[in-house]
Amino acid sequence: MYFVADVKEKECAQYNCKQCVLFCPEPNCLNFKASTNSAWVWYDRCKGCEICVYVCSDLLKRHCIEMVMVTPKATAKS
């Protein structure tokens, strides 16, 4: 089990700032969806560094991203 970022879509859509996307060090992990005006996380790419949480919660005081625990997918043996 490990932690990944999870965006609260409705709260994020209120701000439309995209700062978390700019600060995420992992390419194509944290993206912005124009149709909902909010960020979204590609869980398989998230390394759990929490930089996005720091930017959103501590710097901007918006609290739209939190870390959630996930379990890795079971790999099938061939």
From Swiss-Prot:
PROSITE patterns named among the record's database cross-references: 4FE4S_FER_2
Alphabetical keyword list: 4Fe-4S, Electron transport, Iron, Iron-sulfur, Metal-binding, Oxidoreductase, Repeat, Transport
GO molecular function: 4 iron, 4 sulfur cluster binding; metal ion binding; oxidoreductase activity
SUPFAM superfamilies given in the database record: 4Fe-4S ferredoxins (SSF54862)
All residue ranges annotated as the 4Fe-4S ferredoxin-type domain in the record: 3-35, 37-66
Domain of life of the organism encoding this protein: Bacteria
Binding annotation for [4Fe-4S] cluster 2: C24, C46, C49, C52
Residue sites binding [4Fe-4S] cluster 1 per the record: C12, C17, C20, C56
Enzyme Commission code: 1.-.-.-
Coiled-coil zones: none
Cofactor note: Binds 2 [4Fe-4S] clusters.
Cofactor: [4Fe-4S] cluster
InterPro entries for the chain: 4Fe4S_Fe-S-bd (IPR017896)
UniProt subunit comment: Heterotetramer of one alpha, one beta, one delta and one gamma chain.
Protein name as it appears in the record: Ferredoxin oxidoreductase 2 subunit ForD
Native species: Aquifex aeolicus (strain VF5)
